[in-house]
Amino acid sequence: MANTGGRIPLWLVATVAGLAAIGVLGIFFYGGYSGLGSSI
């Protein structure tokens, strides 16, 4: 992870990872709120 000369910028990786985490949490909480996530 110390190599900053990689092909993928670190900010891009962090942005994608953040959006993915928010999306997964959003779907999980939405499913639990609507009663569909109780089976997960």
UniProtKB/Swiss-Prot annotation:
Keyword tags: Cyanelle, Membrane, Photosynthesis, Photosystem II, Plastid, Reaction center, Thylakoid, Transmembrane, Transmembrane helix
GO biological process terms held by the UniProt record: photosynthesis
Cellular-component GO terms for this entry: cyanelle thylakoid membrane; photosystem II reaction center
Primary subcellular site in the record, as a coarse category: plastid
Subcellular location: Plastid, Cyanelle thylakoid membrane
InterPro entries per record: PSII_PsbJ, PSII_PsbJ_sf
Membrane topology according to the record: Single-pass membrane protein
Domain of life: Eukaryota
Function: One of the components of the core complex of photosystem II (PSII). PSII is a light-driven water:plastoquinone oxidoreductase that uses light energy to abstract electrons from H(2)O, generating O(2) and a proton gradient subsequently used for ATP formation. It consists of a core antenna complex that captures photons, and an electron transfer chain that converts photonic excitation into a charge separation.
Subunit structure: PSII is composed of 1 copy each of membrane proteins PsbA, PsbB, PsbC, PsbD, PsbE, PsbF, PsbH, PsbI, PsbJ, PsbK, PsbL, PsbM, PsbT, PsbX, PsbY, PsbZ, Psb30/Ycf12, at least 3 peripheral proteins of the oxygen-evolving complex and a large number of cofactors. It forms dimeric complexes.
HAMAP family referenced in this protein's UniProt entry, alphabetically: PSII_PsbJ
Entry similarity comment: Belongs to the PsbJ family.
Name of this chain's protein: Photosystem II reaction center protein J
Organism this protein belongs to: Cyanophora paradoxa
